[in-house]
């Protein structure tokens, strides 16, 4: 739902309203997908009309977020909760427990919900090369992205993350290493979190294209 004030200022909308605007937008999207005609007058949007063609089958909506309100919205308004790539396993499992409780409160069966997961993945022929790539491309981009006003827990003030510190920071968060290391990490998320749909982010700005294609 966004978190950077300049992005909201650019469009003249309030950062404080982002959650309510997001929820209203989701309700409107579902109405447009499923109803022949929509006459909608909400707090933020007013629409009278229809869209064509309609989806030939239901389109699942996966919602992210970590806060209690985000998890509640994912249960009430979405078809799955899809965690982002940076939370460690402990935080994943704690949020999953809350999300499943929200599903029950919403009258939904937790066992029927998909369990997707997004992870940053860096795989190379050797473990050493994978960690080298992770520092050079993944962590550098995290520092560029989150080094400003909103401090991501993975980002410190240092210009470079020592490999030993990088390993500690990314344990149970990222999937980094040689193929065997990556298989082991993915299986761990499957055994503990129950992931059934893994979204691997394999490309990071500046990373050699030939490496990605391999």
Give the ranges of each region predicted by the language model.
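Active-site-adjacent structural elements that line small-molecule/cofactor binding pockets in enzymes
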Residues: 1-214
